[in-house]
Amino acid sequence: MSKLVTFIQHAVNAVPVSGTSLISSLYGDSLSHRGGEIWLGSLAALLEGLGFGERFVRTALFRLNKEGWLDVSRIGRRSFYSLSDKGLRLTRRAESKIYRAEQPAWDGKWLLLLSESLDKSTLADVKKQLIWQGFGALAPSLMASPSQKLADVQTLLHEAGVADNVICFEAQIPLALSRAALRARVEECWHLTEQNAMYETFIQSFRPLVPLLKEAADELTPERAFHIQLLLIHFYRRVVLKDPLLPEELLPAHWAGHTARQLCINIYQRVAPAALAFVSEKGETSVGELPAPGSLYFQRFGGLNIEQEAICQFTR
């Protein structure tokens, strides 16, 4: 059996794979910059080689549609699923974290949010959304972030309907005497030890693939390249979306997130041309072929090294 196939099968079987999560990864990575729509049969064809049947796909699509993440249209007996406005908005928000090439720059300022008069349920929901955006809880009603823009946070608060119940402050970096205490507080409030462990697990899972891609280069078919890319982004996404993406100045020494990101970039650059061609071959929309990726697709990870000639060689 091919070494790459063995790796792919091991990655699929290592942990339980949620259908809704995997297909969310597929839409975000392969379809969101190509119109966001695809025929159900095409999705089944893309995932068949990973051992996921049509029932798996149908169940996941049904749930994503029910959650308002996907829209569905039917032409005859065919069903086409596309990203809804909600799905596209959440996808764009996520990809700003997933495809970063480096830690965010920092001007030394902190954004502080103090919540007032919110019931426990609403407060818990707002805190969950803010934590996803990189905030940490300094106190039960006080959230802080060193890297969020006020305009983005205000949009989130308005969407949640709590803008009138949250007071926003801006603060400068603490004085030099406070830095040791600050680092300790940051590590605790942002759960950096647990985040670092998740990155280490990702590295252990995908680092063996780097030499395999060199040793078994002739085994890298477009289908295998797509499967590798999907699994890579799926598992990386699960880790990086929990990362607050703190500035370099606030991270502990030997932060595994740097290694994990570079590992992901290196593998992604290697398999992307063939994976892109495979999606083009199998993908079908309600009006025919999938459109070519938009320009933002090629800006991922600081810029993808994909030439048109490299894509064409996999479609011949």
Question: What function would you assign to each model-found segment?
Answer:
Residues 120-215:
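Mid-protein regulatory/catalytic core that forms ligand/cofactor-binding pockets
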Residues 68:
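Glycine-centered, phosphate/nucleic-acid-interacting loop/turn motifs that mediate DNA/RNA or nucleotide
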Residues 96-138:
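Amphipathic alpha-helical dimerization/coiled-coil segments
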Residues 52-63:
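Short amphipathic alpha-helical interaction segments
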Residues 180-316:
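C-terminal regulatory/effector modules of DNA-binding transcriptional regulators
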Residues 2-29:
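Short alpha-helical segments that sit at the start of domains
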Residues 74-80:
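Short, Lys/Arg-rich nucleic-acid/phosphate-binding segment
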Residues 34-46:
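Short acidic, hydrophobic short linear motifs in intrinsically disordered regions
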